[in-house]
Amino acid sequence: MKPQIEVVVGDITTMEVDVIVNAANPSLMGGGGVDGAIHRAAGPQLLEACKTVRQQQGECAPGHAVITIAGDLPAKAVIHAVGPVWQGGENHEARTLQDAYLNCLRLAAANGYKTLAFPAISTGVYGYPKAAAAEIAVDTVSEFLTRKPLPERVYFVCYDEENAQLYQRLLIQRGLTPDA
């Protein structure tokens, strides 16, 4: 069966899915971009949950992910994934980004979540080239979904049409659109 992957232009904090992914920083304490938006929309409970995780485990290393409550968000949970900072591509950034996506998918599956929404991890202040990051995201997610029953559906939530078109083109090229 073909993986169920959709591209959406919009605000990830309003997605009515089981779990959303936060492009977090290692401190898990919120920040700019999507990280700050998710923390603001979720309310103080999310920061408290992140503080607890940090006290138990320390910082979250690049490529890793942790799961928390969602606070005031419509989602049931938030998976905080730390992607790599782009350093030119010679420091295992691609592998680290792939690991971040895989660890999110594994956490969602382990918790029985059927629907998952991803932002474009590492493409903001971390500077990962958007096209290369989209390719890693689409390939990693589609490969995982063909081998595992959960999650059943994944959304790539893009903040603008330009980014969404990158993902949509990749889905078409790989025959992953519903009509392909």
UniProtKB/Swiss-Prot annotation:
What molecular function does GO assign, one term?
Answer: ribonuclease inhibitor activity
What Gene3D superfamilies does this protein map onto? Leucine Aminopeptidase, subunit E, domain 1 (3.40.220.10)
Entry keyword annotation includes Chaperone: no
Kindly give the InterPro entries that the UniProt entry links to this protein.
Macro_dom (IPR002589), Macro_dom-like (IPR043472), O-Ac-ADP-ribose_deAcase (IPR024900)
The record lists substrate as bound by D11, I12, N25, G33, V34, D35, S122, T123, G124, V125, Y126
Where is each Macro domain found?
1-175
Tell me which EC number(s) this protein carries: 3.1.1.106
- Catalytic center residues: D35 (proton acceptor)
Query: Listed disulfide bonds for this chain?
Result: none
From the UniProt record, list the reaction(s) this protein catalyses.
3''-O-acetyl-ADP-D-ribose + H2O = ADP-D-ribose + acetate + H(+); 2''-O-acetyl-ADP-D-ribose + H2O = ADP-D-ribose + acetate + H(+)
Q: What Gene Ontology biological process does one annotation of this record name?
A: purine nucleoside metabolic process
Pfam families this protein is in? Answer: Macro
Keywords for this protein: Hydrolase
**From which domain of life does this come?**
Bacteria
Subunit notes for this chain? Homodimer. Interacts with RNase III.
Q: What does this protein do?
A: Deacetylates O-acetyl-ADP ribose to yield ADP-ribose and free acetate. Down-regulates ribonuclease 3 (RNase III) activity. Acts by interacting directly with the region of the ribonuclease that is required for dimerization/activation.
Q: Which family does it belong to?
A: Belongs to the MacroD-type family. YmdB subfamily.
Query: Know the name of this protein?
Result: O-acetyl-ADP-ribose deacetylase
Source organism per entry reads: Enterobacter sp. (strain 638)
* Gene that encodes the chain: ymdB
